[in-house]
Swiss-Prot record:
Organism: Haemophilus influenzae
GO CC terms: cell outer membrane
Further remarks about this protein from its record: This protein is subject to phase-variable expression associated with alteration in the length of the CCAA repeat region. This mechanism is called slipped-strand mispairing. Addition or loss of CCAA repeat units would change the reading frame and result in introduction of stop codons downstream of the repeat region. This may be a mechanism of regulation and a way to avoid the immunological response of the host.
GO MF, one annotated term: siderophore uptake transmembrane transporter activity
Subcellular localization, as worded in the UniProt entry: Cell outer membrane
Short motif TonB C-terminal box, span: 976-993
TBDR beta-barrel domain residues: 193-993
Protein name: Hemoglobin-binding protein C
Location of region: 3 X 4 AA tandem repeats of Q-P-T-N: 26-37
Gene3D superfamilies to which the protein is assigned, alphabetical: TonB-dependent receptor, beta-barrel domain, TonB-dependent receptor, plug domain
UniProt-listed InterPro entries: Plug_dom, Plug_dom_sf, TonB-dep_rcpt-like, TonB-dep_rcpt_b-brl, TonB_Hb/transfer/lactofer_rcpt, TonB_rcpt_b-brl_sf, TonB_rcpt_CS
Membrane topology: Multi-pass membrane protein
Domain TBDR plug: 58-185
Amino acid sequence: MANFRLNVLAYSVMLGLTAGVAYAAQPTNQPTNQPTNQNSNVSEQLEQINVSGSTENSDTKTPPKIAETVKTAKTLEREQANNIKDIVKYETGVTVVEAGRFGQSGFAIRGVDENRVAINIDGLRQAETLSSQGFKELFEGYGNFNNTRNGAEIETLKEVNITKGANSIKSGSGSLGGSVIYKTKDARDYLLNKDYYVSYKKGYATENNQSFNTLTLAGRYKKFDALVVTTRRNGHELENYDYKNADSLTQGKKREKADPYKIEQDSTLLKLSFNPTENHRFTLAADLYEHRSRGQDLSYTLKYQRSGNETPEVESRHTNDKTKRRNISFSYENFSQTPFWDTLKLTYSDQRIKTRARTDEYCDAGVTHCQGTENPTGLKLTNGKITRRNGTDLQFKEKGTAADGTKTYDFDTFIDTNNQEIVGKLNLGYANDTWYDCSLFDCKDGTKMKVFEGNATYGYIGKWRESELETEVLNGRKFARIKDRKDKNNRDNRKIKSILPSSPGYLERLWQERDLDTNTQQLNLDLTKDFKTWRVEHNLQYGSSYNTTMKRMVNRAGYDATDVQWWAKRTLGKSHNFFTGQDIVETCATTSSSAWNAFLCPRVDPEFSYLLPIKTKEKSVYLFDNVVITDYLSFDLGYRYDNIHYQPKYKHGVTPKLPDDIVKGLFIPLPDKPNSNQVKENVQQNIDYIAKQNKKYKAHSYSFASTIDPTSFLRLQLKYSKGFRAPTSDEMYFTFKHPDFTILPNTNLKPEIAKTKEIAFTLHNDDWGFISTSLFKTNYRDFIDLVHKGTRKFKVGKPGSEGEIEFDTFQNINRDSAVVKGIEINSKVFLGKMAKFMDGFNLSYKYTYQKGRMDGNIPMNAIQPKTMVYGLGYDHPSQKFGFNFYTTHVASKNPEDTYDIYAKDKNQTDTSIKWRSKSYTILDLIGYVQPIKNLTIRAGVYNLTNRKYITWDSARSIRSFGTSNVIDQSTGQGINRFYAPGRNYKMSVQFEF
């Protein structure tokens, strides 16, 4: 109730401040919807760039468009945005999806997220996640795939357009809950009044210890102009609350400190343009982006646990992830007015996106503390001979004197240089199996090696023996063995043994690298035409697009060794063929032991994949018309047609192979008692069966919006729009076969559909500001979901000795529908009209409340809790300094508004998610000062009161199963790892000329 009173109070204050607007100027209708691929003539375009480079909807006195927010470069600079999460920090109803070690993965808007919110950069759709629930069930909880949507470098962006609600007119497939559209900068943004521009910007943020440097160069020479924006960022993991005091030694799911990662990001934007005449413009552009993250998954639940340095470490999990995007484009613009267009733009783009997850399992505790290289006795090589750590001869515990007067020793008890006895830490190896590498050991003629001669073939009691070495060349290298390794009957002398450290002498490294590649070639034609029919104005935008996208997965894995020590085995040796009586020199190709020797026989497995490579062809045409009937009435009419064709492109022997076991016998049964060749043939037949299932989709999208200005201070906006999302290739074609979890492909899926209805009331005045209230409702249908299809019997076992067992089968189908309703308030009031001393001050308020349910009264987890943002801002009249003070309040996530999809599997009657976000209020203070014309200093304090809180998006990223992003579900230990940073700071300095 307190929150409700607060909302009413805020609304009343804003309403009162905007009430005296009866004498405002005549209104002008603004289009409520515009496609992303829009152009205008040269003068209009330059004017638009000028405006967008300095202001945005919420900064101007123009009322906002319905369900649309524009963030410009100036706003992003003012808010000190460093990543996509910062873009929507002070927006309500839009958040960023958290993806653990991989960072962020797209946006959540109006109850849906990731692939159901479109993301475009310069008209190009960005990489989509593998959204098949089957794939997520199998792989996502284990950190093996970088299954995220790629981001963008903030410093290269001219504008970010955020649309809430269905709107495929702008973005095509994927815009169910909304869209986020990025536009990159252009040289013309900076060269309005001069022929050059230079900027250097350096910043730092304490939340992740990130520093960044950005250099911007723009210039014009005769008919050419160019732009270069290059940015480099270096930082580490986001520091959760109480990061500096958290225990850094705890490992596993109970770890409370964020896992350590080194994060780097490089971005370069290049644009070169040629204007042969004022009506023609050619542009060649390159947008290069790479995000890298390297570190350790210390919260990984399968991490080998040790209590301290008293026990050697076996291995730990290291990560080396990467997201790389490269877009090369060429565009031609024509500004000659013709009966068919006022502006024309033709663009060809070649975009390649790679998201990579790499993990390396190896010990990094140092040679002394790693099990593979431990040498507690301190044995070393001194001038080619084995000695103690100080170079003296080896010593063992004396046991007595033999009958011949020689001393006997306990060769299991080593005497260190400090006279400490070390028991059981040496390896006494059979002399016949011990090969000394002559590049390390002294193998000269007559050289003798001190070895152990036991009293028996077993045990550790024996005496010293000096034996000559016998050299031999194996595979081009010289090795030596003890000459006395044979007895008088030429049998192995099991009493003679070598003395070496007990560890293998190298560290094993098991690595795997998994790539998701999305390569797109796209051709766009965009035209605009302004004309009148009678007294009705038309602002027409139309065009078409054609693109091909190849999406594939490539998995690599291998096994090798690092930190090789002097005692490591350097050869596989020889084996004796009893049939021929000959010794055979072993190689990695002939010995069975190679599978266990990472140093001598490292391996790289053949490339494989869990997905068929899919080529997608998309064709689309769109038409958008802003129809201005009078100064008081206008309409926006939009239509788009999409044709999408999926074609699997699998070539046997060329394409990375699908594992045999996940497809054999799946659709085409195995013959009775098949041999290995028949199994191989059956695998190919089943892959061919899936690969021949091409699929086509056709989609019609539309949008209708009306803007009515009954008075000079009141605006009414209505909107009705339809969006769609075609099934992704993995949702249709992903196949997996296992007794517990078999996934069948389904090429009969229908597109997901969203329809949005929205109405907005706005009070506005050029001098006072605006307050806008909107009500919305979005209906979703044909959500794609994974369902259990029953059991089927499949043959299992070795060829020729199979049996049949039942497999649980699952398949994606169109099932769920959903409804999301809500209310939003957006307002900004300029206080200068109230009193002269308040000139430059402004108040703002944003509020979003939404509620949604799927069929069966199931809550939608992607809906954010009730959120409000209060703002107080000031700008000096000459822009010498200014500040913004934001108060963000987020309500608790109620248990009845959450749904645990695994509750049934866990035999829980309570289907709510156990660990949720509580209500919190955050204060941020941001300011800037311009002491001289060419210098701007910005600084900010975030979470001013050092509040401990967790966002709902972080809380819902906690997985109830798997090995990554998990906590102790019973006690909650480990959840602090997901908390937001405490009080933190940002600062940047920018020089402009």
